[in-house]
Amino acid sequence: MTTTLNADPAELAKFSELAHRWWDLDSEFRPLHQINPLRLDWIDKLSPISGLRALDVGCGGGILADSMARKGAHVVGIDLSTKALKVAQLHALEAQTPNVAYREVSAEALAAEAPGAFDVVTCMEMLEHVPDPASVVQACATLVKPDEWMFFSTINRSAKAFLYAIVDAEYLLKMLPQGTHEYAKMIRPSELAAYCRRAGLDLQQTRGLEYNPLTQRYSLSADTGVNYMFAAQRPA
């Protein structure tokens, strides 16, 4: 596990600059709001979260953390963007979201502090933004209790992902700001699977997320060519 802070200052600055727009449904974060019901339902079916202690790694403005808390989980969201965390905290206060707290701490630091403290760990749309994604996966594996679940989502490093996630989403459809994603930082499913194996995790399920520009809707799919999610368990 890395000993230096596993963060890219440019990435932190980029998302901090947009922090005030996290809960604007017509902003650059609209895609996250659109996919959130799909990923929340998928998580809840594999690991019913009501009453569980959940950790959301790279929580940003709290979109997933807030929705898990509203499903009955006791949630801690962590991030390294001070501005994003302030937005998440303010939203929780205004929306009166129960049982959610936010901390400015890295996954690695929290893993050293509280190993095996959580019933479920999520790390969504974050791995492609850090210098050492394998270190984050290892930290997640340390943080979750034995026999419990972790959920990851990221973007494939493929020609299709370059076309859809960068050219289309950032330049043609302008769904995201230019420079949101860097092709070299995207992660192939085989690479994420290798990170999971090295962390001692058992991969249980893979799902793709597909976007239909005509209906402007996302759906779960077997196609992992662009956005995809992994469900893994820490062995008992």
List PLM regions with ranges.
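N-terminal, positively charged/glycine-rich alpha-helical extensions of SAM-dependent methyltransferases
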Residues: 1-24
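Conserved alpha-helix/loop element of class I SAM-dependent methyltransferases that forms part
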Residues: 33-52
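Conserved SAM/SAH-binding beta-strand->alpha-helix loop
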Residues: 81-83
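Conserved SAM-binding strand-loop segment of SAM-dependent methyltransferases
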Residues: 95-109
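A short acidic, Gly/Pro-enriched loop at the edge of an enzyme's catalytic core
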Residues: 111-120
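A short glycine-rich, Lys/Arg-flanked "PGG" loop and its adjoining helix->strand segment in the class I
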Residues: 134-149
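Conserved class I S-adenosyl-L-methionine
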Residues: 149-173
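Acceptor-substrate binding/catalytic loop of class I
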Residues: 174-191
